[in-house]
């Protein structure tokens, strides 16, 4: 799964800001404030309409956040996918908010231990991510990237066309000034 996502410029391991930073110690709060300055900011709305934020190291818009697509397409739940190298991808979406500390690959033993004690999230459905769900996310990401590419081309073409018109008008004005 990880290689498929990386091959399609889809990001995991994004650091999602918790709903409240007040329970964190001052060092962790300072680390989150430092991430605001150093990383790309990904913003979405949870089910109550509040803004939620994630931070990733890749600043290019060519990369899409996997967790936001899962949240938008499939809603609340505990999503996981086992890989061959004894790691498991884990994502928890609760009340439309991506839970901080998830959207990452963890050791399978740790995942199994977490699933034995799901008290805080026992109301959420546990879902194994399948190839079908991955392909839906990849398709949506490609469609979004295509629309971004079209918008970039339109903006660049508009600027180029505007520049050409400006230069033509400037040349015409200079011609009338010189010709008298």
Go through the PLM ranges and name each one.
Residues 108-116, 134-135, 157-162:
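Short, surface-exposed, charge-dense and proline/glycine-enriched linear segments
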Residues 118-153:
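Juxtamembrane amphipathic/hinge helix adjacent to a transmembrane helix
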Residues 1-125:
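Cytosolic/nucleoplasmic/matrix-facing N-terminal domains/tails
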Residues 139-180:
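C-terminal single-pass membrane-anchor helix
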């Amino acid at each position: 799964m990880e290689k498929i996502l990386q091959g399609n410029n889809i990001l995991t391991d994004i650091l999602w800001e918790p709903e409240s930073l007040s329970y964190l110690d001052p060092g962790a709060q300072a680390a989150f404030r430092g991430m605001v300055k150093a990383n790309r900011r990904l913003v979405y709305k949870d089910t109550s309409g509040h803004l939620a934020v994630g931070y990733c190291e890749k600043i290019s818009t060519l990369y899409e956040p996997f967790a936001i697509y899962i949240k938008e397409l499939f809603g609340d739940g505990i999503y996981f996918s086992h890989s061959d190298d004894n790691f498991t991808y884990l994502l928890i979406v609760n009340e439309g908010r991506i839970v901080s500390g998830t959207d990452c690959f963890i050791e399978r033993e740790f995942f199994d231990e977490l699933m034995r004690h799901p008290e805080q999230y026992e109301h959420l459905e546990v879902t194994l991510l399948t190839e079908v769900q991955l392909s839906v996310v990849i398709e949506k990401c490609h469609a979004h990237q295509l629309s971004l590419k079209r918008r970039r081309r339109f903006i660049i073409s508009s600027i180029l066309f505007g520049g050409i018109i400006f230069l033509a008008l400037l040349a015409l004005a200079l011609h009338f000034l010189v010709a008298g």
